Amino acid sequence: MKAYVFPGQGAQFSGMGFDLFESSKGAKAKFERANDILGFKISEIMFNGADEDLKQTKVTQPAIFLHSVILASCLGGQFKPDMVAGHSLGEISALVASKCLNFEDGLKLVHSRAKAMQKACEANPSTMAAILGLDDQLVEEVCKNIEGIVVAANYNCCLLYTSDAADDRCC
């Protein structure tokens, strides 16, 4: 089985998508269409922008969406996935890649989502940290000793299956 699994916010990097823009007429057309839809040159920020600009939610989310969808489109003839999935923002990329949602509507949805999240972040300044490799109880204990509102969340479980066991569960 082959799958596209699309990332959420946090996968951005300066220069993302430039290789696609340079090598594919279809990708270039989508970047230019995105610039028009968004009302700003997202491609310039993605290709040449400062990390601080790219980290803003209102920029990051459309950038990751664009990169994901354009990359999937460019690979389309060579790699046909059996399924698509995404994490958070990546769910919208998956909808577009699977043709359940068209590119323009997907981008408009992501843009609206990103602006709303940016507004919420500005109204309620906060931060998030990923803690890896520590026991959940220890993380909760540390959180109790920090002033202000601190919440341990996003508990992820570790799973390990042999290939046969994973196939049995999935198929």
Question: PLM features: residue spans?
Answer:
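A short, hydrophobic C-terminal helix/tail in secreted or cell-surface proteins
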Residues: 165-171
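Alpha/beta catalytic cores of group-transfer enzymes, especially the acyltransferase/condensing modules
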Residues: 9-11, 38, 98-160, 164
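Helix-rich "cap/lid" substructures immediately adjacent to catalytic or cofactor-binding pockets
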Residues: 2-85, 163
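Gly/Ala-rich beta-loop-alpha elbow adjacent to hydrolase catalytic centers
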Residues: 86, 90
